[in-house]
Amino acid sequence: MLDDYYTWTYPDIPENVAQELLQLNGSLVVVGVVGRSDCDLANKMLAFGMEPPDDHTPEDGQIQCYYKPGTFSLLLHFESTYDAEISGQMIDVCIEDVDTPFDIDSFFERIRCRFVRMMLLALHVCHIVVWAKFAREQHLMQFLPQMLRETPAARISERTRLCAPRILFLFENFPGDEPKTRESVSTCEFQMEDCIYELLRRYNIVTNSSSNSLVALPNNKQFVFFNAHEELRDDKLLKAIDCLNETMYKPDLKEEEEDLEILAMAPFDGFVKPFTMPVYEKEWENLQYQEDHTVWNFLQRHVHDALVGCFDAGSFKQHAQQGPFQLLNSREWHDCMATMHKLLVENAKDPDHETSNEEYKLFLKNFDEDLNYEKKFWAHLCELGLKKGIAAYKNAAPANYGTATHRQLLADATLAFEEEGRGPQAQAALAKLAAICHKHWEDGRQQCEQLSLRSHPCTLPKNMPHEKHNSGVIHISTCNCGRTQGRREDPFNLRQANYEFYEHIAQMCNLCVKVKQYQFPIFEPSVSDYRAAAFEAAFPLLNTGKSGAPQDEDAGEDEAEEEEGQERELPTKKQLQNTASNCCSHPLSPTFGSDLNMSIAGFGASLKESQARSEQLSNSEQNTTRSGSSSVDTENELVVELQEPAKKEAREDVGPTDAVSTSTTEYLPGLVHTVSNFDLLPLFPSWSLACVGPSSIYSHNTGLQEHFQSGFLSGANFLLPWDVQLRLVHALKQQYQHHHHGKKQQRWKKQGDRLSLKIFVGMEYECSRGHRFMMCAPDRVLRGGADIERDTCSKVVHNNMPLYYPCPCRSQKNFLAQLMRIHVVTPKAPVNIIVDPKVCVGRYTFTLGSILPPRLSQSAYWIIRLPYVYQGDDVLIAPPDQLDPDYPLAGGYLLPGMFGVVETDPTLDLNEPGMMGASAAGNFTRI
């Protein structure tokens, strides 16, 4: 027993308290206290002067009972989720569950449902409910009377409750800006009663009939209480400060002694005190009002109404019939309480609870859903938004569209959904919207979306068969000779990009059918079931295991590698036999780029071929070096040592120099580069080399005319002149036989065997709109004849030329132009120009694919067309989306040193097909 009352946790009632409650017989009034609290013990009984034990732990659904001896009321304190301590416990549990994200809407639904269950219990087992919130489910009447019929709770009549409980409202705090007088407090209470009564009547919570009312209100009695005079939860810090001030206050003792002396001189007590009897009476009335204005007295007035039997009579005006009001003894009430607690609270916590009453089963199942009206409201809004979003997507969707269009349509549908959809179910509704739109897209409206070599998706339907892809993107490109421009579809394979288009447009060009084409070596099958080469054979750059063996490997592995290296050296030895008898100034490396200081890691057998050939040609290089530096006057001259021409019969016996054993069953699937195997050839040529006419068709005064080369921008249609100083050095035997030379060669001898070659070179770039222009430097577009200086061409041929450069055409979109052609006008001289272009893209260096570079005929206009698309070993090398000004060579570049010069072979007819690469073209001097 605490102070003057008993307290226990239901249903553990102490035996002595049970005996006292039995002595009350039928005079026990049950008062339920339900509401909110913000203290650690979740105590709402502090206004009644009652507290739980010190070891009490608040829990959801727990009922703490209070009884004061000598009274007729049993107080039930319902601890619910509306208590701050219990809701804090639930929040802690949710936060500790890391697998489930915390959702405030779902959390609020749970605490409200649990509170309403406790409220339902209070409304059925209490006569008076203090500070309650109303949410009684009326359909409890469909099953509760039947289920209570065979239980001890059958005594509480067919209305399944003791009475229509009288609802009282307790406000623990009085407004601080109002005076705490009797008139002010009463005014606040009356105003609040009017507001509450109007609200409850409007929503039919209180009616004129007790059987149809959820709760009852007293007719002529106060049912709102403001705690204005008692500080329930005082600030402990402020209280400690006040105590400290009282302790530190020291009154003046001398002043008190003087007061006592004055009072001693008075003739009678009270002689010097003023007569203020009205003030004392008013203060006494206020003190008396403060003593009487307590929650306990307020509650006892309503308890008295219940004891005398006028509980409902004062609550309902129009119906005078006796309502279902019952007073039970403690044992009967306890049995009734146990039954109601089990039906309304305990069974709801058990999801596996079985019952034969269908109405009760539906109540347990649908209680949370019926109560969460906000959830229904949000669901309705999301349903409206979902319909609006689906309609927006379907109305804007074309017949066929790709992923980018689908994403844009889905984004627009999401915006349409958000105009209506709200609440915690919006994310699930958006996921459903995305699934419906995705299904609509895949239902015969999805595009193929196979990416082209220019990274454009195919626009044809995915579920319909089509022979070839089509992205709908059209480019303007020029033919091999540069005369005719045409529209080309976006290519989807290497053959379309580098071969088929140029073959197709050549049939429409009246110049392409007449020009002399260089025949690049291609694959010639000997069987019908030829195939692409195996990955390791076709792409040795990726076969890093053959670049070198560790020193601690087994001897068997070393022998296998040696045998494999010997097999790869066989075609190289045949080639060395054809070139060993000839001397050259700067021989072309058989690895197509080993003389460019490239990395030799992973080159495999090609590196061995390069080393073997370098050893055999070292003597000729030393001789050439001595001859090229013999005189100081010839520092700016290129020295070409004239060799003794071989006889035609001897050449036929030796055979062509580029005769290398190639595979006739396997082909190279990509472009030829510096480390691809020599015995593998591509199915089609990706390069083009054509002689479009004599050198006289180009005039440096007018540049390239539109009728000859179409699509050039104004001022960017000039070739760059290149003056090359050359000196011929005769072989020993030829010095005694120059009387056998022709007249033209004798004329060159008279000029001292020194030649000044006039070569015209142009690096042509072309964008996807068909605009063509020349470059006069790696970072400068040719703007006219004023940009051409004496050393302008040297900037082009002796520097890395970028593979991509921004097109100078005026357009909102910055188009990238690609290096597509190299124009060469050869001079009239007893020498031939050799071309050996190498394009470096990423880690690959692409070449023409010929063992020996082609030689160009004299006094002719030649055009080298570069590949439209570059493909490496394992992946397509796509052009960059935009060019970084700080790194213009990041997309690729043309290596310098692609031109060479070699003496003219009078026994070789370059007009014959396939002879431009024949003879000793591998022995030439690089310019």
Swiss-Prot record:
InterPro entries: SMG8-like. Keywords: Nonsense-mediated mRNA decay. Residues 543-581, 611-636, 643-662 are annotated as: Disordered. Residues 551-566 have a biased composition (Acidic residues). Pfam families: Smg8_Smg9. Involved in nonsense-mediated decay (NMD) of mRNAs containing premature stop codons. Probable component of kinase complex containing nonC and recruited to stalled ribosomes. This is Nonsense-mediated mRNA decay factor SMG8. It comes from Drosophila sechellia (Fruit fly).
